Amino acid sequence: IPESVALITKVVREALSGGGVSPQDCAGCCVGMPCYGENPANDREIVRLLTDALTPVPVYVVNDGEVGWAGSLACGEGIHIVSGTGSIAFGRGCDKEFARCGGWVEFFGDEGSCYWIGRQGMSLFSKEADGRLPRGPLYDLVHGEFGLTEDYQFIDRIVREFAPYREKVAGFQRYVLQAARAGDTAAAALYETAALELALMIRTLKAKLRFSA
C-alpha cells in the first residue's frame, strides 16, 4: 500500500505542477484503487496515507471500476465493464443506485480477462501436449515461442517466469489469440467462453439495477 500511495502522490503532484495548479486551488482529488472496498482495514490505511500525502487537497477514494464508469459514462446511468488484466463490471441505475459484479481476485475470479484466458491457455497447451485434446496451432506456437525441445519444459518456464507475475500470465493471452486466429478451435472456444462470462456480469447488473431505457 505505501508504494502505491507514493506513486499516486507523485503522479498527482506532477499533474498539478504541469498544469500550473496549486494544491490549495483543488476542490478535491478522486483516486480509483483496485481492490478498494474489499478489505476495511486496507481501505482505512489507503485513505489515511493518501490524505496525509495530498494535504490540503481533499481525497475521495473509490474502486477503480467506479472511476472507469465515471469516465466512460460521464457519471450517468449504465454499465461499465473492464476486461484487461482482470475483469469487473460497475453500473449505476436511473435512481442513482450502484452495483458491481466480478472483480473478485485472479485466483478464483476475473473471468473473461486476459489473466483468465492466459491461465486457461496454459491449461489448453498441457491438454494438447499430452493428448487430452487434439493438437492445434497453440501447441506448435508455444513450442516455437518458448524454444521448447520437450513438452514438460513448459512447467519450469511457467512456474519461474510467469506464475509470480500477474501481468505476464495475462500476457500469455496473445499466444492464445494467435492460435485462435490460426484455426485452433479449442483456443477460439476460450474467447467464446470469455464473452459469455463478461455478458453474465452485464446481465447480472442489468437485473440488479433500474434503468430509464
Question: Where are the model-predicted features located?
Answer:
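Short glycine-rich or small-residue beta-strand-to-loop segments that form or flank ligand, phosphate
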Residues: C29-P34
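Phosphate-binding/catalytic loop of phosphoryl-transfer enzymes
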Residues: G37-R135
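ATP-binding/phosphotransfer module of carbohydrate and carboxylate kinases, centering on a glycine-rich
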Residues: I1-G28, L49-V57, G71-I79, S123-A213
